[in-house]
Amino acid sequence: LKSGATCIAYETIEVNKRLPLLEPMSEIAGRMSVLVGGYFLPKHFGGSGVLLGGVPGVLPGKVVVLGGGSSGINAARMAQGLGADVTILEVDVERMRFLDITLHTAHTLYSNRAHILDMLPEVDLLIGAVLVPGSRAPKLIDREMMRVMKRGSVFVDIAIDQGGCAETSRPTTHHDPI
């Protein structure tokens, strides 16, 4: 500040309600969330043993994505590419229409506590991809809701850099993500 320099946090630059400089990182985070989450689903990692894409005679895994922004749509695309059954919960109806047209086989559902609770008992991989520009992420999942998830399910919270979207979320590292 003493130097008189003008400093700009690039990730917060907003153009037409979008964060264009944050988008590339969000795209990567969304895609990686499915790969990393799927990696921890085998039983030897404490997961449920579900293969996200399934195989003939076995249903695919269920992936639920909270938030349909850049991270969320990329998580959904990656999960669809693996053959998973994908549902995206979103609060913006126009965005849901876009997701429906763009992702074809993914289901969209209005995001609220009741719908999240309905999804949790069956989810194999839950991805938190909510972003409120300039604010902390809303806490969509509390401790009691986490207990509803089946044993061995995996939760990846992309929103952790904004405080996480679950009450139990805490920062981890790529080296030690659990």
Predicted regions and their residues:
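Glycine-rich phosphate/diphosphate-binding loop of Rossmann-like nucleotide-binding domains
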Residues: 46-128
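Short, hinge-like loop/turn segments at secondary-structure boundaries
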Residues: 24-27, 103-109, 172-175
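Glycine/serine-rich phosphate-binding loop and adjoining beta1-alpha1 elements at the start
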Residues: 1-61
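Rossmann-fold NAD(P)-binding glycine/threonine-rich loop
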Residues: 1-17, 137-178
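Short acidic, glycine/serine/threonine-rich loops at helix termini
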Residues: 19-22, 77-78, 98-101, 166-170
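Short glycine/serine/threonine-rich phosphate/pyrophosphate-binding segments
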Residues: 70-76, 96, 134-140, 163-168
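Short glycine-/small-residue-rich Rossmann-like dinucleotide-binding loops
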Residues: 112, 131-134, 159-160
